[in-house]
């Protein structure tokens, strides 16, 4: 994806989901912000990490949150993670003639943890781990090498942080800290910020 840069990753393990993204918002060579949160909680057991245009990230996070809330109130039941990912794909696809320029890793749990990757026009692909953005090739190299299905949630957090650090070290459009969203299976999501120097 050309344009604004970023690195966002997602990892699924048996104990939950980890989503992480760096905090730099840049356009070309200009850094507009060093504190742009590109990781979003969605409901009480889902979230997304994004790369692309910051306003588009915020718009799809709000739209998806509202649609899920409406569904859950109307139907008196929780929306499945796969259904929420498909809904996000429909939101993106409905704008295909004027796309929302955001690549997204979406994850959460219902009967099991799940991760989905979406492109700006709504393609939905289920994965065990993934990276998006300008730093994705660097992050994926580490994820491909180090990911194991039997990892603990803590090991997945460390791998997500390290993969974003590696990408930020070489991708000038990524940097300035990492936001990490941890969604433990059966638990509540939590976000923390990690320094790139840590």
Curated annotation (Swiss-Prot):
It is found in: Cytoplasm. It comes from the Archaea. One of its GO terms (biological process) is proteasomal protein catabolic process. Residues 1-6 form a propeptide. The keyword NAD does not apply. GO terms for cellular component: cytoplasm; proteasome core complex, beta-subunit complex. Keywords: Autocatalytic cleavage, Cytoplasm, Hydrolase, Protease, Proteasome, Threonine protease, Zymogen. InterPro entries: Ntn_hydrolases_N, Pept_T1A_Psome_bsu_arc, Pept_T1A_subB, Proteasome_bsu_CS, Proteasome_sua/b, Proteasome_suB-type. GO terms for molecular function: threonine-type endopeptidase activity. It is an enzyme of class 3 (hydrolase). Its EC number is 3.4.25.1. The formation of the proteasomal ATPase PAN-20S proteasome complex, via the docking of the C-termini of PAN into the intersubunit pockets in the alpha-rings, triggers opening of the gate for substrate entry. Interconversion between the open-gate and close-gate conformations leads to a dynamic regulation of the 20S proteasome proteolysis activity. Pfam families: Proteasome. It catalyses: Cleavage of peptide bonds with very broad specificity. The active site is at 7 (nucleophile). Component of the proteasome core, a large protease complex with broad specificity involved in protein degradation. The 20S proteasome core is composed of 14 alpha and 14 beta subunits that assemble into four stacked heptameric rings, resulting in a barrel-shaped structure. The two inner rings, each composed of seven catalytic beta subunits, are sandwiched by two outer rings, each composed of seven alpha subunits. The catalytic chamber with the active sites is on the inside of the barrel. Has a gated structure, the ends of the cylinder being occluded by the N-termini of the alpha-subunits. Is capped at one or both ends by the proteasome regulatory ATPase, PAN. Belongs to the peptidase T1B family. This is Proteasome subunit beta 1.
């Amino acid at each position: 994806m050309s344009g604004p840069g970023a690195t966002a990753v997602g990892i699924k393990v048996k104990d939950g989901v980890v989503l992480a993204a760096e905090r730099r918002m840049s356009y070309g060579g200009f850094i507009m912000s060093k504190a742009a949160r590109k990781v979003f909680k969605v409901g009480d057991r889902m979230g997304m990490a994004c790369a692309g245009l910051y306003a588009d990230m915020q718009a799809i996070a709000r739209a998806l949150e509202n649609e899920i809330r409406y569904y859950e109130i109307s139907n008196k039941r929780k929306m499945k993670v796969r259904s929420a990912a498909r809904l996000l794909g429909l939101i993106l696809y409905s704008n295909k003639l004027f796309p929302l320029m955001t690549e997204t890793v979406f994850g959460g749990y219902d009967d099991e943890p799940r991760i989905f990757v979406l492109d700006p026009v709504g393609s939905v692909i289920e994965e065990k781990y993934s990276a998006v953005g300008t730093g994705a090739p660097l992050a994926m190299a580490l994820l491909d090498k180090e990911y194991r299905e039997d990892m603990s949630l803590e090991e997945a957090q460390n791998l997500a942080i390290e993969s974003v650090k590696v990408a930020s070290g070489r991708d000038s459009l990524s940097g300035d800290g990492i936001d990490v969203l941890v969604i433990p299976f059966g638990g509540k999501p939590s976000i923390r910020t990690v320094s790139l120097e840590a």
